[in-house]
C-alpha cells in the first residue's frame, strides 16, 4: 500500500465559483504550525486578474476555502 507524502495529504482541491460575472478560485496552502492559508484568485474577462495570498489562517482547510470564497464575493460586491 502506497503512503502519501505529508505535503500531498494537506493539499485540497480548489473551489471554483462565479459571482456577478467574476470567476473566483479559492484554494488553500499548508502554512506554519499546521495551519491552512486561505488564498484567492479573482478573474474577469475585462479586468486584470487579482491574486490574494494568505487572506487569513485556519486550522481546517475547508474553513479556509469557505472564508476565501466569501471574501471574494464581498470584494466583487465592493467593486461592482
Indicate residue ranges for each PLM-predicted region.
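A generic "cationic amphipathic patch" detector
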Residues: 34, 53, 76-77
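A short, exposed loop/beta-hairpin motif centered on an aromatic-Gly-Thr core
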Residues: 49-63
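Short, charged/polar low-complexity linear motifs in solvent-exposed/disordered segments
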Residues: 42-44, 55, 67-70
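Short arginine-rich
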Residues: 70-80
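N-terminal segment of the canonical double-stranded RNA-binding domain
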Residues: 2-39, 43-45
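Short, surface-exposed linear segments at secondary-structure transitions and domain or protein termini
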Residues: 34-36, 59-67
